[in-house]
């Protein structure tokens, strides 16, 4: 069951992130060197985890009034056990409880465990014309960091009965 991370568990999530990122080498994607996203977390209320000790995590924030899934990582040794799906469900539930109309994310379009996986879990591609200013800035920031080494898409899962007007 997904839960909020305990502050003392954050350092252990670095191994989860690095191991999950290593899978991308199978499809020719190598991330630029540097600190992991989880190492930059200062607020434990931005991280949901699954497992004891955590085998996966969801790092969340707010972008244009939507809950944004900054990263979802599951240790490869624990993949295909429903951990990612439970984390996405917990993110969706948190978005609903917080009054967010949707959950957004950016991901690789053609990596099987990225956009196609998210589509099976309720996300759909969000056309660029519908991106808000913060989402546009986030995508540009990812490009500057060198993350866009393969085609990427923005996806959204509507969690409220209808999207709120801008």
Residue spans for each PLM region:
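Short, P/G- and charge-enriched loop/turn segments at secondary-structure junctions
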Residues: 36-38, 139-146
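Conserved beta-strand-loop-alpha-helix junction that forms the acyl-donor binding cleft
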Residues: 105-114, 131-136
């Amino acid at each position: 069951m997904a839960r909020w991370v305990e502050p003392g568990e954050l350092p252990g999530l670095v191994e989860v992130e690095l191991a999950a990122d290593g899978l991308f080498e199978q499809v020719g994607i190598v991330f630029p060197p540097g600190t992991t996203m989880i190492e930059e977390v200062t607020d434990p209320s931005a991280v949901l985890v699954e497992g004891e000790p955590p085998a996966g995590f969801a790092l969340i924030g707010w972008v244009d009034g939507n809950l944004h899934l900054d990263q979802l990582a599951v240790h490869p040794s624990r993949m295909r056990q429903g951990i990612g799906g439970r984390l996405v469900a917990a993110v969706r539930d948190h978005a609903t409880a917080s009054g967010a109309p949707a959950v957004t994310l950016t991901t690789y379009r053609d990596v099987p465990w990225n956009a196609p996986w998210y589509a099976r879990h309720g996300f759909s591609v969000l056309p660029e014309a519908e991106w808000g200013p913060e989402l546009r800035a986030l995508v540009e920031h990812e490009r500057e960091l060198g993350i866009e080494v393969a085609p990427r898409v923005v996806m959204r899962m509507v969690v409220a009965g209808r999207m709120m007007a801008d």
